[in-house]
Amino acid sequence: MRVAPLLSDEESQELFEANLPLAGILPLRMELAFESGVPVEIKKARFRLRDSSGREWKLLSPKSAISRIMSANDVYAYNPHSRKQFEKEFTAYVIDLKSPLSDSDRHHRGFLFFQTPEKSPVESPRGLVLTVEKLPQPVTIQLTDN
């Protein structure tokens, strides 16, 4: 498992055409790789993100992340076709957690989206630790320094 947070506004803007950190959303780029001989069911996996203060960041569904982006940018009136197009493009980046990792499907790549504890903009978070539970073995990864 490899994980990298997108911490800069520029990266977020370029990739998603939206400033996710300003909306209080931290996108985590993930890669899950199949390395065992037995298929690994990942749809029951639980992803938890905590900062150095012990506060838990909320995992957002793509739909919730989109609503948060729209709300944070005060977008209340929009062309329905434009929103559908944005949703389609945004969800194309989401990691597939529904299909198991197996010999025929060895890699899953994409993003998970976490909201800051107070819905405030993401500003150089310290001591971020990602914990993945309900896998054959739990995984803990330090993402940022304390």
Give a label for each model feature.
Residues M1-N146:
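Conserved functional micro-motifs across diverse proteins
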